[in-house]
């Protein structure tokens, strides 16, 4: 993959317009891996490129927003606000090839976290409405494959969440038991 962490240059802008290049970038998103190259080309043509300046927000927790983002260059961090203290906690750092907002392609829930740029970043954005129209045109088989991919992604995330939850509960119990012995 080409180094896209540097500021925009004319060759990069041309590269972003290249449907074949874009179709290859979409392979980074599991949801699209089973789509044909021609389908990925059409998806790429529906999206746009967004430049997010350093410290600016790509999405804000709680805001309505229906669309997917693929990081083409730069680095962003994901923050979740603590409902008790209102403090923001960094959950993850994202880089080129990472994506976020996939669930909003079929879920109208507000954003669950804030994503901010650590450096100027370049994102491919795909609005949910445009993608829904694409799926309608592609037919039932493509829709079924997409939703099967979604189920796979959700089950993987659920397994990780379960593992993390169990680990955190074990740590809390160890800490609580140690405190009671003191």
Question: Where are the language model's segments positioned?
Answer:
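Cytosolic regulatory regions built on CNB/CRP/Popeye-like sensor folds
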Residues: 1-182
């Amino acid at each position: 993959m080409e180094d896209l962490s540097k500021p925009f240059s004319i060759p990069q802008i041309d590269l972003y317009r290249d449907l074949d290049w874009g179709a290859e970038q979409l392979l980074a998103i599991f949801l699209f891996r089973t789509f044909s190259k021609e389908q990925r080309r059409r998806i790429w043509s529906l999206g746009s490129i967004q430049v997010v300046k350093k410290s600016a927000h790509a999405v804000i927790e709680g805001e309505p927003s229906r669309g997917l983002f693929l990081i083409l260059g730069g680095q962003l961090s994901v923050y979740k606000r603590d409902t008790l203290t209102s403090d923001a906690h960094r959950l993850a750092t994202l880089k080129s090839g990472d994506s976020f907002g996939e669930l909003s392609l079929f879920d109208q829930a507000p954003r669950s976290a804030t994503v901010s740029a650590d450096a100027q970043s370049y994102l491919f954005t795909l609005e949910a409405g445009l993608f829904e129209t694409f799926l309608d045109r592609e037919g039932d088989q493509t829709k079924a494959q997409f939703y099967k991919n979604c189920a796979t992604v959700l089950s993987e995330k659920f397994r990780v969440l379960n593992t993390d939850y169990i680990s955190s509960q074990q740590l809390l119990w160890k800490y609580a038991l140690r405190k009671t012995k003191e």
